[in-house]
Swiss-Prot record:
Record-stated family: Belongs to the RNase HII family.
The protein's name: Ribonuclease HII
Location of this chain's protein in the cell: Cytoplasm
Keywords, sorted A to Z: Cytoplasm, Endonuclease, Hydrolase, Manganese, Metal-binding, Nuclease
InterPro entries: RNase_H2_suA, RNase_HII/HIII, RNase_HII/HIII_dom, RNase_HII_arc, RNase_HII_hlx-loop-hlx_cap_dom, RNaseH-like_sf, RNaseH_sf
The organism of origin for this protein: Methanosarcina mazei (strain ATCC BAA-159 / DSM 3647 / Goe1 / Go1 / JCM 11833 / OCM 88) (Methanosarcina frisia)
Functional description taken from the UniProt entry: Endonuclease that specifically degrades the RNA of RNA-DNA hybrids.
EC number: 3.1.26.4
Signal peptide limits: none
Binding site residues for a divalent metal cation: 7-8, 105
UniProt KW Nuclease keyword: yes
Catalytic activity: Endonucleolytic cleavage to 5'-phosphomonoester
Key word Cytoplasm present: yes
Length: 220
């Protein structure tokens, strides 16, 4: 029986893409993930995540990372909520893996609702398989199911790679990209002042952080 885990990295940042990772592995060898020391990606150092990502890809029966750019997120937010965006993105990963059982980290306050919505979305493109697949969604699934931890790790490593690429491309260290990061906020304030409140396409324009900074700049 094939099981899969799906998780995201970068849902909350104001800068950079979001990555949704999926890992598929035969249930009979899923214990390998525990042996590797797979754990919640947030609790691992970047170096350890990179090492594990390489091992995960080697042992997995399939994996896929779906990348969503800041501008794509902004466009989607015009017609749907962030929770709905997560459902669509998770379904994209599911389409690539087609396991017998999928464990998904719930991107909704109601985990069961997220599972139902994910299955409904998946059925739009894979109606036959949607009748057979079992969808399990839980909060903090990455801390419960090693296969979800594995998905979280490959997603986080890929997002970190993309963030470093952006820093090199723009020759700017904007920090982690999270609104709570002083370096990120400092970059946004400085850029906003220098460019009349306009921001580059690496920034999620629909984020409240950006709106707040624009309001601050108007007052000053």
């Amino acid at each position: 029986m094939m099981i899969a885990g799906i998780d995201e990295a970068g849902k909350g940042p104001v800068i950079g893409p979001m990555c949704i990772g999926g890992v598929k592995i035969d249930e009979s060898k899923a214990h390998i993930l525990k042996v590797l020391g797979v754990a919640d990606s947030k609790k691992l150092t970047p170096k350890k995540r990179e090492q594990l990502a390489s091992q995960i890809k080697k042992h997995a029966d399939g994996y896929f990372i779906f990348e969503v750019s800041p501008s794509q997120i902004d466009e989607l937010r015009k017609i749907m909520s962030m929770n709905e965006i997560m459902v669509v993105c998770f379904a994209k990963v599911l389409e690539q893996l087609k396991p017998d059982i999928v464990y998904a980290d719930a991107a909704d306050v109601k985990a069961e609702r997220f599972a139902e919505n994910l299955l409904r979305q998946y059925a739009k493109t894979s109606p036959d398989h949607a009748k057979k697949i079992k969808v399990v969604s839980m909060h903090q699934a990455d801390a419960i199911y090693p296969v979800v931890s594995a998905a979280s790790i490959i997603a986080k490593v890929r997002r970190d790679e993309l963030i470093e690429e952006l820093k090199r491309e723009w020759c700017i260290d904007f920090g982690s990209g999270y609104p709570s990061d002083p370096k990120t906020r400092g970059f946004l304030l400085k850029w906003g002042k220098e460019h009349g409140g306009d921001f580059p396409d690496i920034v999620r324009q629909s984020w409240q952080t950006v709106e707040n900074i624009r309001e601050e700049l108007k007052k000053s």
